[in-house]
Amino acid sequence: MGRTHLFTSESVTEGHPDKVADCISDAVLDALISQDKNCRVACETLVTTGVAFIAGEITANATVNFPDIVRDTIRRIGYTSSDMGFDWQTCSVVTSIDKQSPDIAQGVNEGDGLFKEQGAGDQGLMFGFACDETPELMPAPISYAHKLTKQLADVRKNGVLDFLRPDGKSQVTVQYEDGQPKRIDTIVISSQHSPDVTYDELKDRIIAEVILPVIPGELLDEQTKYFINPTGRFVVGGPMGDCGLTGRKIIVDTYGGMGRHGGGCFSGKDPSKVDRSASYMGRHVAKNIVAAGIAKRCEVQVAYAIGVAQPVSVMVDLMGTGRIPEADAERIVREVFDLRPAAIIDYLDLKRPIYGPTAAYGHFGRTGDSFPWESTRRADEIRGKAGI
């Protein structure tokens, strides 16, 4: 019998304070890029009791009302009453916006700087990952954790569980045998709620309306453990309970800790920032390799120097599951995919207001127009070059 082990990943709802910040930052980006597709945006947000701060470096031929964007985002998330400690109508909005440094701009603008191609917006390393554990080629723990938090938000917004409030988290522990998910060992859900609901009702209703509708029944058994609001009470939450910052949930945003992370966040950054665009491309490359049947698991690393178009390194790790040598996989990646920043932006069509939906419930393993990197359109070409 092979090895049995547990692996855990977490997700958070859009009402978690760090996700409120991410949602605001990406709402600002979408508003700007919808008017100026070549805008340069690095928008950071901080939210706390009754206040939202936005700051950063923005260069754009656009006119936007930052306080209106902030308030509308907070309203859509669901902070609509002052008794939550954070209310879209009454919160203060403070802004401090500068222009992008000209020293950075000359390395990114095509035709400027030491190199004439559009270079990377910064140095850095980015990872992409895919595996065959789920239909969307994502790790099972983070996939199910996202499904739970999305369901938490849905049953709150549609009134099925009208005692829920926007802040919430999930955590899923999956038991693996021989590297494959076999069952769910533990589910943790913490959801902010109104003060008048009893603990027993909250626990029973969350199991019935959140967990059971989205987790496959064959993965649950009598030994599965459920921890629902395990402190017993979660009335104070959101920005009133914790200060929220853009970029504080980078593992939730990606692969739940399965697969490595280069450290750069995504939200509030226009696609000239390779932290975002190259991470999306890394996911696209890894997913197409797995979809092609070359490997069951794949991790891709790409790294850049600021102002330089060609990546300084490209690495493909098939994690012991490959049907071809990794050196051949790297060669195929370089032949099939153009990993220069401008080429990535053009290939994935990233100069569009598509970023708002990415800000909560994961940037990967999703469907729809906001997630072009999830396409497997190059799988057949990769399979052909691999000769399998």
Swiss-Prot record:
Gene: metK
Record-listed E.C. numbers: 2.5.1.6
Organism annotation: Desulfosudis oleivorans (strain DSM 6200 / JCM 39069 / Hxd3)
Matches recorded under Pfam families: S-AdoMet_synt_C (PF02773), S-AdoMet_synt_M (PF02772), S-AdoMet_synt_N (PF00438)
A molecular-function term among this protein's GO annotations: ATP binding
Its biological purpose: Catalyzes the formation of S-adenosylmethionine (AdoMet) from methionine and ATP. The overall synthetic reaction is composed of two sequential steps, AdoMet formation and the subsequent tripolyphosphate hydrolysis which occurs prior to release of AdoMet from the enzyme.
Domain of life: Bacteria
Annotated residues for binding of ATP: H16, D167, G168, K169, R233, F234, D242, R248, K249, K269
Keyword ATP-binding recorded: yes
Upper lineage: Bacteria, Pseudomonadati, Thermodesulfobacteriota, Desulfobacteria, Desulfobacterales
Quaternary structure, from the entry: Homotetramer; dimer of dimers.
UniProt similarity note: Belongs to the AdoMet synthase family.
Swiss-Prot/TrEMBL keywords: ATP-binding, Cytoplasm, Magnesium, Metal-binding, Nucleotide-binding, One-carbon metabolism, Potassium, Transferase
Compartments, as annotated in UniProt: Cytoplasm
Residues that, per the record, bind Mg(2+): D18
Record flagged with keyword Magnesium: yes
PROSITE patterns hit by this protein: ADOMET_SYNTHASE_1, ADOMET_SYNTHASE_2
UniProt-annotated binding residues for L-methionine: E57, Q100, D242, K273
An annotated GO BP: one-carbon metabolic process
InterPro entries: ADOMET_SYNTHASE_CS, S-AdoMet_synt_C, S-AdoMet_synt_central, S-AdoMet_synt_N, S-AdoMet_synthetase, S-AdoMet_synthetase_sfam
Name used for this protein in its record: S-adenosylmethionine synthase
Positions of K(+) binding: E44
Pathway listed: Amino-acid biosynthesis; S-adenosyl-L-methionine biosynthesis; S-adenosyl-L-methionine from L-methionine: step 1/1
